[in-house]
């Protein structure tokens, strides 16, 4: 498309012809921080943002940084297939949070609570969910956040599909 060609030419004319900074271009990081601040109701600066080539790498880096051999990781199932493979690669034990069709693929907070052990370290939240399209309501987002706090769990929230929510309200654990 002509606008992409023009943007590429403009970037070259402006000297963007070398590797950028490892965390990403400052202007992009600041714009992402503004977007997150506005959509989640939290204060984020460009210094809090790292740009990666897609969501998978940063989720993978997070798993590698936080999950040790034998740590349990709660993740939505059905869900993005890469969650389970990343947990396994990091040496963790995948613990599926079952999203059943009989519950419209919504999470059962009491069931999640029963799955938490002393080895549970991380909880993955994905809403809207891939591939089901289900969302976690505000009450359950709060309850999951409270569980994470009570059991000292880190939460990896995958909000990538929030722009594909066509009815209802988007709720993210980062807003709490």
Q: Which ranges hold each PLM region?
A:
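Active-site phosphate-binding strand-loop segment of PLP-dependent enzymes
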Residues: 95, 100-174
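Conserved PLP-anchoring active-site segment centered on the Schiff-base-forming lysine
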Residues: 65-87
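Glycine/Thr-rich phosphate-binding loops of Rossmann-like dinucleotide-binding domains
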Residues: 59, 83-84, 132-133
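Short glycine-rich anion-binding loops that position phosphate/pyrophosphate groups of nucleotides
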Residues: 56, 80, 127-131
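N-terminal small-domain helix-loop-helix segment of the aminotransferase-like
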Residues: 1-54, 61
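A short helix-loop-beta submotif of the ANL/AMP-binding
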Residues: 89-95
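Short acidic capping loops at alpha-helix termini that bridge into adjacent secondary structure
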Residues: 44-49, 69-72, 119
């Amino acid at each position: 498309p002509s606008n992409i060609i023009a943007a590429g030419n403009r970037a070259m004319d402006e000297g963007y012809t070398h590797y950028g900074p490892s965390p990403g271009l400052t202007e992009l990081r600041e714009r992402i921080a503004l977007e997150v601040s506005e959509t989640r109701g939290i204060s984020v600066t460009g210094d809090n943002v790292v740009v990666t080539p897609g969501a998978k790498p940063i989720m993978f880096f997070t798993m590698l940084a936080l999950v040790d051999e034998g740590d349990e990781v709660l993740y939505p199932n059905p869900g993005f297939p890469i969650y389970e493979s990343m947990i396994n690669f990091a040496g963790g034990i995948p613990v599926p949070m079952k999203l059943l069709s009989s519950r419209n693929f919504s999470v059962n907070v009491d069931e999640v609570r029963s799955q938490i052990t002393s080895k549970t370290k991380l909880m993955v939240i994905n809403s809207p969910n891939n591939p089901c399209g289900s969302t976690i309501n505000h009450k359950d987002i709060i309850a999951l956040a409270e569980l994470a706090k009570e059991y000292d769990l880190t939460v990896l929230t995958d909000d990538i599909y929030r722009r594909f929510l066509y009815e209802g309200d988007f709720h993210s654990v980062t807003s709490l």
